[in-house]
Amino acid sequence: MQTLPIVDTSNTASSQHIFDTTIKRRKTRPVKVGNVTIGGGYPVVVQSMINEDTLDIDGSVAGIRRLHEIGCEIVRVTVPSMAHAKALAEIKQKLIKTYQDVPIVADVHHNGLKIALEVSKHIEKVRINPGLYVFEKPNVNRTEYTQSEFDEIGDKIRETLEPLVVSLRDQGKSMRIGVNHGSLAERMLFTYGDTPEGMVESAIEFIRICESLDFRNLVISMKASRVPVMLAAYRLIAKRMDELGMDYPLHLGVTEAGDGEYGRIKSTAGIATLLADGIGDTIRVSLTEAPEKEIPVCYSILQALGLRKTMVEYVACPSCGRTLFNLEEVLHKVREATKHLTGLDIAVMGCIVNGPGEMADADYGYVGKTPGYISLYRGREEIKKVPEDKGVEELINLIKADERWVEP
């Protein structure tokens, strides 16, 4: 997915008169995942996950390809068993042979050392869940964890994690330490409670093990299904890492966001809030829908925040009694005619009151001035007045005259 450069006005001659609205992103180290880089000032990366069974090799290849073709830059695949790990090797080979190489993340959970070691040979990144990687079955009769019991499990975690860390380190591959609020280890729950603090300490424990083995190709996530918990956890991990001199990139997401309009709003509320604060280097919108439905939401969030510009930005007033044409209908026509373009700002304004002033930053404007006619603008300059029924056609002609039109 092409991303146009975002104009930085901070160093212009008149910058002292401009309030800089550019989001200042938290500084993080670059982590390579195949041919994609997360963090390090690179554009925020868009991810998703296929929902095919990994044992279905052809179906998985097709699912990965569908996502990649519409702009998904890294694709995650579940690997619950050794059979799935071996199937993933075939998926990777077939993908390269029939399409192209796509960065893949293997999702490994319960007691997954052997599985993770196998998949690390074939793909670019392994995701592990600290609460499940060394799975301790909860003891319903337990009332506390002594420090020695806590440390004993910590030693077991290190023993189990070390071979994977060494393998990834020596191959130049990466790992996501993916904490989920709903699957914290029992010892963390007893020590910190079901809290963002417990999530953060769970991640920090794994980070320290990796660092002790000189492995820093890490991405961290703090996912929760409730937005306030997710926000608190990400803000806390960013604060803790800054205090500890850690600069690992963060993968943002609201897990189990649901579907439809509310699922999109819920994901946006969590992801966009953090991105606006400069927190986050890669995102996934998790919807209970086909994975392909997640990608446009990701790019819309990034475009709305000015972090990536990959489509036309439409500016349109909400309509009122002053509107001189059917604004909803015209906006739809303009969008359908121009949505394939990249990087333009087009304003559709219903009257002269909102028109020139509020669309001043747009590349092109379509404004109702008198009944039956619309005025076309290039930036702040009025170019021509045309009959309403010729408005969209003449807008296209204006874009063509500026050599900014491409055929769909």
Curated annotation (Swiss-Prot):
Pathway: Isoprenoid biosynthesis; isopentenyl diphosphate biosynthesis via DXP pathway; isopentenyl diphosphate from 1-deoxy-D-xylulose 5-phosphate: step 5/6. It holds the Pfam family GcpE. The keyword Mitochondrion does not apply. GO terms for molecular function: 4 iron, 4 sulfur cluster binding; 4-hydroxy-3-methylbut-2-en-1-yl diphosphate synthase activity (ferredoxin); iron ion binding. SUPFAM superfamilies: Nitrite and sulphite reductase 4Fe-4S domain-like. Its cofactor is [4Fe-4S] cluster. Its EC number is 1.17.7.1. GO terms for biological process: isopentenyl diphosphate biosynthetic process, methylerythritol 4-phosphate pathway; terpenoid biosynthetic process. Binds 1 [4Fe-4S] cluster. It catalyses: (2E)-4-hydroxy-3-methylbut-2-enyl diphosphate + 2 oxidized [2Fe-2S]-[ferredoxin] + H2O = 2-C-methyl-D-erythritol 2,4-cyclic diphosphate + 2 reduced [2Fe-2S]-[ferredoxin] + H(+). Keywords: 4Fe-4S, Iron, Iron-sulfur, Isoprene biosynthesis, Metal-binding, Oxidoreductase. [4Fe-4S] cluster binds at residues 317, 320, 351, 358. The keyword Nuclease does not apply. It is an enzyme of class 1 (oxidoreductase). Converts 2C-methyl-D-erythritol 2,4-cyclodiphosphate (ME-2,4cPP) into 1-hydroxy-2-methyl-2-(E)-butenyl 4-diphosphate. Belongs to the IspG family. This is 4-hydroxy-3-methylbut-2-en-1-yl diphosphate synthase (ferredoxin).
